[in-house]
Amino acid sequence: MLNLYGYLRDKAIFVSPTLQVDRPSPDRKESMFGYIYKKDAAAIAVVLCLCLGVGSFFDYQISSALFNIGSMYGRFVEAAGELPFELTASIAGVMLVRSARPDSKASKWLAALGVLINVGLVGYEIIGSLRVGGKLIAFQLVLTFALVIAANFIAYRLTRTTAPDELARWALMVLAVWVAQAIILNVIVKPLWSRPRMRVIEVTPRLNFQPWWVIGNPDKWAYIAAGVIKDGFKSFASGHTAHAAIGLMLAGLPAAAFKEKPSRRRVIFWTAVVVAAFVAFGRIVIGAHFLSDVSCGFALVLALECLAARIAYPNGVQ
């Protein structure tokens, strides 16, 4: 009898003589998409579905209430909103360089790709900033380059003992997600939907609001011929929000410190979620997108990240 009591005591917490609660095993593994906790992904998915539902009925009303073409916050987000992607892609490029091995020709090609990625990001950032214009250019460029350098230094410190193959695996996962979302959004979704942006609707006579579920705009080319910019019909879905959501992949850095401290990995993940949410809000304020646009852009990248993490880390990263 005493042995039975000892067994039950080890397996459960006795709260009262009539109530007992199972004690979770310290070795129990949480359900994962690679390095992403499924319950975290599910929580974000629920919020995005709610936002899409609200946007389905009140997209135009929300944008009308928030629209401010002169908003400094909106302009800053337009210039720097893709910073999470740039940080992540830059770190991925550096990881590819660090993964090079003298005995592997393939790793050397990947290292060259890593160099090209960072050179391309510098040019992309400068050109993008000049296109936006305004007094924020200098501040935004300095902020971007300072954060990229700091992020790469921190990533190096955390992964200095990580195996080269692990560095390459994470970096290639990031690049795969970026390429996939770029093709889906820029080659398929945006041209196919041709949804007019709020800021274009406001200044273009007889150009009406188009719900997100309506695919294609038969009057698009007539308006473009009349002088409306082609970019004005790329509202659905939000590329800035999608790029900001790529920052969630920083939580998957294959560092031993992260594997030993899942809570730290979660802090990075949820911090990136909050940053992406601020970017999404800024895109609505400046009239570049509607609530449904940013919701779908975020959802696309989240789905791609879960899929890529599941493939890259099939056994999960606890």
What does each of the following model-derived ranges do?
Residues K135-P164, A171-L172:
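Membrane-embedded alpha-helical bundles of polytopic integral membrane proteins
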Residues Q61, T161-R265:
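Membrane-interface loops
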Residues G120-L141, L172-R197, P262-V285:
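Hydrophobic alpha-helical transmembrane segments of integral membrane proteins
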Residues L2-L147, K190-W193, R197:
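N-terminal transmembrane-helix/juxtamembrane module of multi-pass inner/ER membrane proteins
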Residues C51, A176-Q181, G297, V301-E305:
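Alpha-helical transmembrane segments in multi-pass membrane proteins
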Residues D22-S25, S56-F57, G93-D103, N152-A163, ...:
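Structural signal for the C-terminal ends of transmembrane alpha-helices
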Residues G6, L83-R98, T144-Y156, A245-M249, ...:
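Hydrophobic cores of alpha-helical transmembrane segments in multi-pass inner/ER membrane proteins
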